[in-house]
Amino acid sequence: MAGIHLHPHDILDEGMPAILQRLDGMKHVEHLFVEINTIFERNPYPVGDLPHNPIHNMVMGTGTLHINTHTDFPRLSQRVDPTILSGADPLMTIKKATDGGKYKVIPWANILNGDFIGDVEHNQVVDFKGRPQAHWLCPNAPDVAQLWQKTFTALKQNYGYDTFLIDRIRFPDWAGKEVNPAGLFTCFCPHCEKKMVQQGLPVNKIKHRLAALADSLKQGDFETPVTALKEEPLLKAWQLFRQQSVTQLVERLLSDAKQTAGGITLWLDLWPPAYSWILGQNYHELTRYSSTLKHFPYHKLGGGADVQGLINHFAHDSESQERAFTAFKRLFELPYDISYETFKQQGFPIHFVAEQNNKVRQLSQPNTFIYSGIQMWNLPASQLIEAVIAAEESACDSLLYYCYGWATQELFDAIGEHNTPNNNSYNNNTVKK
């Protein structure tokens, strides 16, 4: 039941015969997670070329919608990609190529991050200083649930799919076109503030405390903010509020779609548990509403976080960078005896993969199906297989590769060879179906 992520440009540029031939060679992929709306991300990230794309060396995501909804969005919508307006339809293309075959398509939607239009002002994320966070919608905003209820209903009616992987169901992290740590100190839009007051949270006191912690970070004091975020009851209550906000959005999406579309199934794309809590993601609560999830314990990339971007934003010499990295490891409970210089060269140790997978199992509701995300770009084949084996030996159920368009043929071949019977000693220890 392994899966792989595909982007719209993969389908439009390469064509389905080439894609399916390459996927057939992997020998265990069954689920194709097809992106229906892009984020502002370079493909591939952060540098390099698309290794088998005959049209583009690289593609920059623009936060646009890549499906035909044929639906009216009166208050809030996502800008439709020009390729759709000119007649392309990558999701329909892959549907026609896979219907009735061995591959199952799962549309993959980025919920709160993109190029949105309409009444953005009353739906956007706002930081602790009152600054809007560009291209981010708030889970407590009034029109977000309706936007996605209409989109999922249209997907079910127009394409026939009723199971979706939902991504970017969180508050902003610090990464993006520019490093922006203020994204972590959100959201203080009118809807969040009203809800916090209703729950007895002192909004101004929280904002003042966050401002003080931001000043500490600017002055090179990294330990005070870490201790505060981990231990202070006020900030822990605020983090819980953020987590409840994200969980309640997922609950609303399911209940609204049940009324209009007869019900849908949502799978979750989450950050590894080391980081998920600070972004508003609570595995224990979210898996009450979704029985399948994926997270991405990419050990070579710091678990998917832009660790270097954050460290270098606050620390500008080797001594302060080491102090910042030590504080970072303490905040996110990463007990690795490695220096910042070693991390920059090697990432986290390989056992990060199993540790995070096992923690997901512990945090999630019983019988949750867990995909371990596998980094399938910007690394040699030997390290790819090392990560695959580490995941296979952990508490996950299957693998989800990121991603088709960024992976070299060498990596596809390595996965196929790894999954060839009697080829290696791990074939009897494959991931559970």
What are the roles of these predicted feature ranges?
Residues 2-9, 88-89, 106-159, 251:
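Active-site-adjacent "subsite" loops/lids of carbohydrate-active enzymes
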Residues 31-85:
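Aromatic-lined carbohydrate-binding/catalytic grooves of carbohydrate-active enzymes
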Residues 10-26, 62-96, 147, 244-252, ...:
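Aromatic- and glycine-enriched glycan-recognition loops and surfaces
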Residues 131-350:
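Polysaccharide-binding and catalytic clefts of secreted carbohydrate-active enzymes
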Residues 17-42, 50, 158-162, 292, ...:
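Catalytic domains of carbohydrate-active enzymes, especially glycoside hydrolases
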Residues 11-25, 144-154, 275-286, 380-390:
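Short, acidic/polar
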Residues 290, 294-308, 343-419:
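Substrate-binding cleft of secreted/luminal carbohydrate-active enzymes
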Residues 1-15, 377-378:
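Boundary/entry segment of secreted carbohydrate-active catalytic domains
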